[in-house]
From Swiss-Prot:
Lineage: Bacteria, Pseudomonadati, Pseudomonadota, Gammaproteobacteria, Pseudomonadales
Catalytic EC class: lyase
Example GO biological process: L-leucine biosynthetic process
NCBIfam families: leuC, PRK05478.1, PRK12466.1
Function comment: Catalyzes the isomerization between 2-isopropylmalate and 3-isopropylmalate, via the formation of 2-isopropylmaleate.
Family indicated by similarity: Belongs to the aconitase/IPM isomerase family. LeuC type 1 subfamily.
Keyword 4Fe-4S on entry: yes
Organism: Pseudomonas syringae pv. syringae (strain B728a)
One Pfam entry name: Aconitase
Any GO molecular function: metal ion binding
Xref: PROSITE patterns: ACONITASE_1, ACONITASE_2
Name of the molecule in the record: 3-isopropylmalate dehydratase large subunit
Length: 474
């Protein structure tokens, strides 16, 4: 009998009941909630006269709708948009009513759900983790079974601590070799999506492995797993190792004392067996990956910074040709235009993909001693949590950004999505460290280019895309 993959082990350890229709009942260890997908779920509980089943499994924070400017210090009443204000207030009210742990808008621990979960040690190896947000795959970086759920499923988990799900197939994405200087986790995952496409992972749980993945920090692994969903996979994960254990140790929600020792011993098994069989295997050579830039309206429309935008006339597949033509029109680009000729209007460094302290350090290394180009209308840096903001300020990163001409903001989802005051104007091009470049994602008519934090900072000071390796020393 073949060995088990990491996903197989996590699935089996959370399986409550296998059902005749092929679906299964899965137990949920950690439930993270925010203000957008939870109000309807709580209302459903009330109508059914139920209460949350396991209060201690839930943590909450507002992130999607919160302002990132100083006005938020005035509290929820300072949120201008009526719907946003109501959603944040409703989250507070629901958490207060049921005694749920919430890091409220002006709590120093507040931040983006997929940043604060790991930061607090609420995400642990071997756990099943869900949130009403598609980028919950981020937490898979800890050897956890993590994925997004819909609002009705949020209610189911609140009420029963279980979820109806179907087991996925196994995909291994192996990235071997050493990353070149200046190439990051963000470049790896964009290259993976460019290779397999946004539907490549449909129906799969992806395990990212190989020497290049093992060499990444935990924050880098979170970036990779975060964008599993952009590759079509609801679940992305990395096996647990010494780096995972060291990252979790001592965090507020992490086990303590004898429980810690038992946990660490159990976590040693959170790897795929040597003889495990994967349904699909994808291989990349890390040495061949260059800094990536998305050019179109899908994350799979991505190229190395030294390449040219594609020419639809050279695409024999009629469907793909049509997609390229539509993307070029929306993005205001010309066939064969060099990536480095794309003029930018705004730069956004933040989101659940790239707003952690290592991301901010990488961007600050590029910005230090330089100025944002005069052609850039706005460049903003939004830390992923209040604790990250405080750490960055302790290191003086805020001063580096401010002196260079960036705006230094409060934590939140910000310009990743047009659900708060931070958004693009129609026709504006933005170098963004976020995860999605769909039409209108950052604002109606906005044009998004996905890049790493270092590449975003380089674009800010250059006014156009440039290979960041031309600006920094090895």
């Amino acid at each position: 009998m073949a060995g088990k993959t990491l996903y197989d082990k996590l699935w089996d350890s959370h399986l409550v009941k296998q059902r005749d229709d092929g679906s299964a009942l899965i137990y949920i260890d950690r439930h993270i909630i925010h203000e957008v997908t939870s109000p309807q779920a709580f209302e459903g509980l009330r109508l059914a006269k139920r209460k949350p089943w396991r209060i201690d499994s839930i943590i909450a924070t507002p992130d999607h709708n919160v302002p990132t400017t100083a006005e938020r210090k005035g509290g929820i009443g300072a949120i201008e948009d009526q719907v946003s204000r109501l959603q944040v207030q409703t989250l507070d009210d629901n958490c207060d009513e049921y005694g749920i742990t919430e890091f409220k808008m002006n709590d120093p621990r507040q931040g983006i759900v997929h940043v604060i979960g790991p930061e607090q040690g609420a995400t642990l190896p071997g756990m099943s983790v869900v949130c009403g947000d598609s980028h919950t795959s981020t937490h898979g970086a800890f050897g956890a079974l993590a994925h997004g759920i819909g609002t009705s499923e949020v209610e189911h988990v609140l009420a029963t601590q279980c979820l109806v799900a179907k087991k996925m197939k196994n995909m291994l994405v192996s990235v071997e070799g050493q990353l070149p200087f200046g190439v990051t986790a963000k470049d790896i995952v964009l290259a993976v999506i460019g290779k397999i496409g946004t539907a490549g992972g449909n129906g799969y749980a992806i395990e990212f492995a190989g020497s290049a993945i093992r060499d990444l920090s935990i924050e880098g692994r979170m970036t990779i797993c975060n964008m599993s969903i952009e590759a079509g996979a609801r679940v992305g994960m990395v096996a647990t190792d010494e780096k995972t254990v060291e990252y979790v140790k001592g965090r507020p929600f992490a086990p303590k004392g004898a429980e810690w020792d038992l946990a660490v011993e159990a976590w040693k098994d959170l790897v795929s067996d040597p003889d495990a069989v994967f349904d699909t295997v994808v291989r990349l050579d890390a040495a061949q990956i260059k800094p990536q830039v998305s050019w179109g309206t899908s994350p799979e429309m991505v190229l190395a910074v030294d390449q040219n935008v594609p020419d639809p006339a050279q695409e024999p597949d009629l469907v793909k040709r049509g997609s390229i033509e539509r993307a070029l029109k929306y993005m205001g680009l010309k066939a064969n235009q060099p990536i480095t000729d794309i003029q930018l209007d705004r730069v956004f460094i933040g989101s659940c993909t790239n707003s952690r302290i290592e991301d901010l350090r990488a961007a600050a290394d590029v910005a230090k001693g330089r100025k944002v180009a005069s052609t850039i209308k706005q460049a903003i840096v939004v830390p992923g949590s209040g604790l990250i903001k405080a750490q960055a300020e302790k290191e003086g990163l805020d001063k580096v950004f401010i002196e260079a001409g960036f705006e230094w903001r409060e934590p939140g989802c910000s310009m990743c999505l047009a659900m708060n005051p931070d958004r693009l104007g129609s026709g504006e091009h933005c170098a963004s460290t976020s995860n999605r470049n769909f039409e209108g994602r950052q604002g109606a008519g906005g044009r998004t280019h996905l890049v790493s934090p270092a590449m975003a900072a380089a674009a800010a000071v250059n006014g156009r895309f440039i290979d960041v390796r031309d600006l920094i020393q090895h």
